[in-house]
Swiss-Prot record:
Membership in a protein family: Belongs to the galanin family.
GO terms for biological process, alphabetical: behavioral response to starvation; neuropeptide signaling pathway
Coiled coil: none
Role played: Hypothalamic neuropeptide which binds to the G-protein-coupled galanin receptors (GALR1, GALR2 and GALR3). Involved in a large number of putative physiological functions in CNS homeostatic processes, including the regulation of gonadotropin-releasing hormone secretion.
Keywords: Cleavage on pair of basic residues, Hormone, Neuropeptide, Secreted, Signal
Cellular compartments annotated: Secreted
GO CC annotations on file: extracellular region
Propeptide cleavage-removed residue intervals: 85-120
InterPro entries linked to this entry: Galanin, GALP
Molecular function terms from GO: hormone activity
Signal sequence range: 1-22
Origin superkingdom: Eukaryota
Protein name: Galanin-like peptide
Length: 120
């Protein structure tokens, strides 16, 4: 009687273990892939293994459907052509702060102690 309990526990534990055939196959990270410029290209697609059987035509049609769905998505703004001229691209930006009757200077360089930079 004392020997049967450990044998039953051992049998249950062995049945719960994964065999190499039932273990999931990890084929890399998966997910989405980027090109060298950092633009999103699409999902990483792995060809089916020979163990999964035929169905080569079904897989190809599935990949085509996936790419058609992805092509229907809107592109991010960074891929659209910029309408700025070369001069606008390299132009020096404004300070962004203008006061009436006050020359355009860097406001924080003329701050007196005890005042904030937005006081006039």
């Amino acid at each position: 009687m004392a020997l049967t309990v450990p044998l039953i526990v051992l049998a249950v534990l062995l049945s719960l273990m994964e065999s190499p055939a039932s273990a999931p196959v990890h084929r890399g990270r998966g997910g989405w892939t980027l090109n060298s410029a950092g633009y999103l290209l699409g999902p990483v697609l792995h060809p089916p293994s020979r163990a999964e059987g035929g169905g080569k035509g079904k897989t190809a049609l599935g990949i085509l459907d996936l790419w058609k769905a992805i092509d229907g998505l809107p592109y991010p703004q960074s891929q659209l052509a910029s309408k700025r001229s070369l001069g606008e691209t390299f132009a020096k930006p404004d300070s962004g702060v203008t006061f009436v009757g006050v020359p355009d200077v860097v406001p924080w360089k003329r701050i007196r102690p005890g005042t904030t930079r937005f006081q006039i």
